[in-house]
Amino acid sequence: MGVFDYRSFKGEAGKALYSDALALTLYAYTPTGQPLASGWTAIGAERLGYQGKVGPQGTFFGEQPGFTSAEVEVLGRYDEAGKLLSIGIAFRGTGGLGLSDTLGDIKNNLLAAVGPVGYAANYSKNAFDKLFASVAEFAKAQGLSGQDVLVSGHSLGGLGVNSLAELSGEHWGGFYADARYVAFASPTQGPGDKVLNIGYENDPVFRVLDGTTFNASSLGSHDKVQASATNNIVNFNEHYASTLENLLPQSILNPLSWKAHGSAGYADGLNRVVDSAFYDLTSKDSTLIVSTLSEASRGKTWVEDLNRNAEPHKGSTFIFGTDGSDLLKGGRGNDFIEGRDGNDTFRDDGGYNILLGGKGHNVFDLQQSLGKFSVVNDGDGTLYVRDAYGGISMTRDIGALVSKEPGFAWGLFSKEVTHSVTDQGLLAGNQLTQYNHSLNGDAYGNALVASVDGDWLFGHGGDDVLRSDKSDVTFVGGAGNDVMYSSGGGANTFLFSGAFGFDAIHGYQGSDKLVFMGVAGAGQGYDYTQHLSQSGQDTLLSVGDYAVTLVGVAPDSLSAGGIVFA
């Protein structure tokens, strides 16, 4: 899965389609007539057999009066032999080669909102009817079909994308009916899944119209879920972070709100989403918080889900830092936080979380005494931090933990203590705090037996056998097909993450907990009851592409309170 999945373009294919669409969109703002690094090259009017107004860099201008400020680029991608493989159509957003073009675009934006019925839907035909007919004939002569065409654009350009998609079945001989459509920051959204509408939740232009209809919410916060749109991506900029600035209403009439709209901010933030290790865990309606803070703000502003001017966010939260030094903060729910480059500081208020520090010296600020946590090192680069309520944070590339310990005046005042992460334990000055006891396997099949209550068993790679007759043991089989035996008391935890394989558990009890973290296709809200099956006396729980067999357990023995999906 992935937040930019579109039709059959899933995972890596969805990423590639997004990248092509963004490259075309950015080119439309700064056309040069020169080939792009991504392989796209402008196709000129002469080659298309088109007669109309064309700019010096090959930009096509609107054909009818009232639409002459509209601009579109037509590009092609070729193989090494020079054969045309695909065509890209990129609508430019508001702003052109002069004041008159910009004013014309503003007029079209206004008419799309409050003008005649159908103005937005018919925009592409009114502006470029003859051009799109020429492109269709040219493409067919080259052996291409509509499936070989990608249409993109930002802002007013996104409106053009949605317009072309809506008209595609009944115009230009239906050639564009099967084209691919990816729009950024579009004020409109076509019906169904014909277009992937990508935008920031706090962009006042994105989804400003309900479909193509202006309504009461258009001038204020407009966060209605749209079927074709990414609905919960937040551009975390200075305006979004400011309590003072948010005393003014979120509105397309508020100039401060427009900080989330620029195409450069789209490229910078969304490219980090695509590059993220968490990408395959996201979906179209995932809550994504993307920092676009300036360098001056990063060291004093916590990036977190403020859920401002929006419908309540649901499910896990994904937070993406910059390549600078960020302050990144999760909430009480389940969070996936990625620091990337720089010396980042992480906080979290509970739940089941995955924190990836990235490069630099990164710190996890516990905000409480170290004694309220148990910390385990799996010997393979992951530090597990369990809080007093049972929540678990899996962390990588964290160089230190910071705790808040009693200070002077009989503990009335607290002090921060930094504990460096070492192979032996957590080192604060000359004081070493041992990690919670664990047994760590390797990349091959291991047989591990718990030796103390509260033990952790890490199988890592290979097909492992993990056994325990102790209580409150945490089993982490890792990759491979693992078998786990539990005959002790207490509440044991069976933790699965990533591509964990096909595992079996013997001795599962109702007091135990099954925890699935970072398993593609099985995030928070996963309805496990739809993925249970019984085989003889056993229960099979399918989770994403993998499964756990609970030996000797009936399906009705499981309850939602004993299973965590994060």
Give the location of each predicted region.
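Short His-Asn-centered micro-motif
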Residues: F91-R92, S152-G153, V182-S186, D348-D349, ...
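A conserved cap/lid and substrate-binding interface adjacent to the catalytic center
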Residues: G44-L150, W172-D178, Q189, R308-A310
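Gly/Ala-rich beta-loop-alpha elbow adjacent to hydrolase catalytic centers
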Residues: G153-G157, V161
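Glycine- and aspartate-rich repeat motifs characteristic of hemolysin/RTX-like Ca2+-binding segments
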Residues: L293-L366, G371-S393, L401-A504, Y528-Q530, ...
